[in-house]
């Protein structure tokens, strides 16, 4: 997902990430404010203890929200690997009518998923294979969209 510059979550799903999106955006803005402090030199004016606390806070925010820092609006669709483990993400997406594409194993209920992909969501090779196909399809779709925009601009 990094290759096509799409937001993703690899750690535990932060509850309310979609349904409480403004609060999550505030946390992301706080993370970028801490980054700005490091670049403009105000970080150096703080005491050693304050710098340590802010560095720890930054690391925690990066771990939980780093990959979604560029997410400025709710996603148009979601891809979930382990529906059984990430049931909160599925519930939030369903509540907001966001289509869900997901790998569904035998221990999961596919009724909540809009586009289930029957696959083993525990084996790393299976996950890697499906994610590679999905990433390739997304990249192809983005390229087609880009070509259409260029074609429309040329006309």
Set out the residue ranges of the language-model regions.
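Acidic-enriched and Gly/Ser
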Residues: 1-64, 68, 72-75, 86, ...
């Amino acid at each position: 997902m990094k290759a096509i510059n799409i937001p993703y979550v690899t750690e535990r799903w932060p509850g309310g990430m979609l349904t409480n999106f403004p609060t999550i955006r505030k946390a992301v803005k706080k993370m970028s404010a801490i980054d700005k402090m490091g670049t403009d030199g105000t970080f150096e004016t703080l005491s050693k203890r304050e710098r340590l606390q802010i560095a720890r806070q930054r690391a925690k925010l990066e771990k939980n929200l780093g990959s979604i820092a560029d997410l400025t609006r709710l996603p148009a669709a979601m891809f979930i690997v382990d529906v059984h483990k990430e049931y909160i993400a599925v519930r939030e997406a369903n509540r907001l009518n966001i289509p869900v594409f997901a790998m569904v194993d035998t221990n999961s209920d596919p009724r909540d998923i809009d586009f289930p992909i029957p696959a083993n969501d525990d084996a790393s090779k299976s996950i890697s294979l499906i994610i590679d196909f999905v990433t390739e399809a997304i990249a192809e779709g983005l390229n087609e969209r880009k070509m259409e925009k260029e074609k429309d601009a040329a006309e």
